[in-house]
Amino acid sequence: MSSPSSESSNAKSSPPKEEYRTPGLRGVKTTTLFRAVNPELFIKPNKPVMVFGIVTITMCVAYIAYLHATEENKRELYEAVDSEGNRYTRRKSSKWD
């Protein structure tokens, strides 16, 4: 009876190699040229760099939106001078409004 128990323990200790394949493209056999051209597919992602990139792009988009909003506000205002020589800022009005 010792032989069946030893066979079951051997089966538990050495699982088939198919279960331990590396997931994704790292386990696929590819050429060196493909790996050189597409290194981002085989390198482990660097999360701090990804977070830095997302924050940087978000800040750039926010800054461009801010510049667009302030430029639009500047276009609608102009400095007017009345008959007495006083200067004041007026909002542009259209003849069609």
Swiss-Prot record:
GO cellular component annotations, sorted alphabetically? membrane
Organism equals Xenopus tropicalis
The transmembrane residues are 49-69
Major localization listed first in the record, in broad terms: membrane
Report biased composition (Low complexity) as residue ranges: 1-14
Q: Which UniProt keywords apply?
A: Membrane, Transmembrane, Transmembrane helix
InterPro entries referenced in this protein's UniProt entry, alphabetically: UPF0708 (IPR026686)
Location(s), subcellular: Membrane
Q: Which Pfam families match?
A: DUF4500 (PF14937)
**Family the UniProt entry places it in:** Belongs to the SMIM8 family.
- Its recorded name reads Small integral membrane protein 8
For region Disordered, the annotated ranges are 1-26
PANTHER family linked to this entry: SMALL INTEGRAL MEMBRANE PROTEIN 8
What's the protein's topology in the membrane?
Single-pass membrane protein
